[in-house]
Curated annotation (Swiss-Prot):
The name this protein goes by in its record: Histone H2B type 2-K1
Organism: Homo sapiens
Function: Core component of nucleosome. Nucleosomes wrap and compact DNA into chromatin, limiting DNA accessibility to the cellular machineries which require DNA as a template. Histones thereby play a central role in transcription regulation, DNA repair, DNA replication and chromosomal stability. DNA accessibility is regulated via a complex set of post-translational modifications of histones, also called histone code, and nucleosome remodeling.
PTM-bearing positions, type N6-malonyllysine: 113
Gene that this polypeptide is encoded by: H2BK1
Post-translational modification Phosphoserine, affected residues: 33, 81
Residues modified as N6-succinyllysine: 31, 113, 117
Length: 122
């Protein structure tokens, strides 16, 4: 596991370096990923199993790819109906179109549950 889990840094921040140095080092830009969330889900499902950095990278690429496919499909659906705003309806339809059978049903129910929880907390 790397030090990136659970830590946030303000964009454009100094990253803890002193400004007194004459030589300016290249600023370390934080790379956003789903690693922390993938790891948490893994521990919920299989608490005794770990994951290698290579496998984590593959999983992160997979999540990014699925997210991009869903976003593109939802945007296409909104465009077809002449709308400029993505709603949960477009996202739900995109999930039904892209994911197979039982996986789509579970994804829709979990998504509905998450939206309900979010709206009730406001």
């Amino acid at each position: 596991m790397s030090a990136e889990y659970g830590q946030r840094q303000q964009p454009g921040g100094r990253g803890g370096r002193s400004s007194g140095n004459k030589k300016s080092k290249k600023r370390c830009r934080r790379k956003e990923s789903y690693s922390m969330y993938i790891y948490k889900v893994l521990k919920q499902v299989h608490p005794d199993i770990g994951i290698s950095a290579k496998a984590m990278s593959i999983m992160n690429s997979f999540v990014n790819d699925v997210f991009e496919q869903l976003a593109c499909e939802a945007a296409r659906l909104a465009q077809y109906s002449g709308r400029t705003t993505l709603t949960s309806r477009e996202v739900q339809t995109a999930v039904r179109l892209l994911l197979p059978g039982e996986l789509a049903k579970h994804a829709v129910s979990e998504g509905t549950k998450a939206v309900t929880k979010y709206t009730s907390s406001k």
